[in-house]
């Protein structure tokens, strides 16, 4: 299951408290984002990934987040360990997302 922060402070607090996290930056108008959304949901719900906190962030709703201000495109996925960015990629790439999650386990 993933979390959908409603504002910047909620996102920052949740991410700070997550030892391991994957952030999915998306937009409602983005076709590739809609295509990869079910994959992200399935991965976030998988029991073997329960030690990872998953976030879905609407970049239009939270555009003041520093991570959103420097964004090149959506969808973008970012892996964090203890608050430090470990990896990032853009695009609706199922295999890249699965590999990112495996590296965090």
Curated annotation (Swiss-Prot):
Keywords: Disulfide bond, Electron transport, Redox-active center, Transport. The active site is at 30 (nucleophile), 33 (nucleophile). The record marks 31-32 as: Contributes to redox potential value. GO terms for molecular function: disulfide oxidoreductase activity; protein disulfide isomerase activity; protein-disulfide reductase activity. One of its GO terms (cellular component) is cytosol. It comes from the Eukaryota. Disulfide bonds join 30-33. Residues 1-104 form the Thioredoxin domain. PANTHER family: THIOREDOXIN-LIKE PROTEIN 1. Belongs to the thioredoxin family. Participates in various redox reactions through the reversible oxidation of its active center dithiol to a disulfide and catalyzes dithiol-disulfide exchange reactions. This is Putative thioredoxin-5. It comes from Dictyostelium discoideum (Social amoeba). The lineage of its organism: Eukaryota, Amoebozoa, Evosea, Eumycetozoa, Dictyostelia. The gene is trxE.
């Amino acid at each position: 299951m993933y979390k959908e922060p409603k504002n910047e402070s909620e996102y920052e607090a949740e991410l700070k408290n997550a030892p391991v996290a994957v952030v999915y930056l998306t937009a409602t108008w983005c076709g590739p984002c809609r295509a990869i959304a079910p994959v992200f949901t399935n991965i976030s719900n998988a029991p073997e990934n329960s030690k990872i906190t998953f976030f879905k962030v609407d970049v239009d709703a939270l555009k003041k987040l520093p991570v959103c201000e420097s964004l090149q495109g959506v969808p973008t996925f970012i892996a964090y360990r203890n608050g430090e960015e470990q990896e990032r990629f853009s695009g609706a790439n199922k295999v890249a997302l699965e590999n990112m999650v495996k590296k965090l386990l």
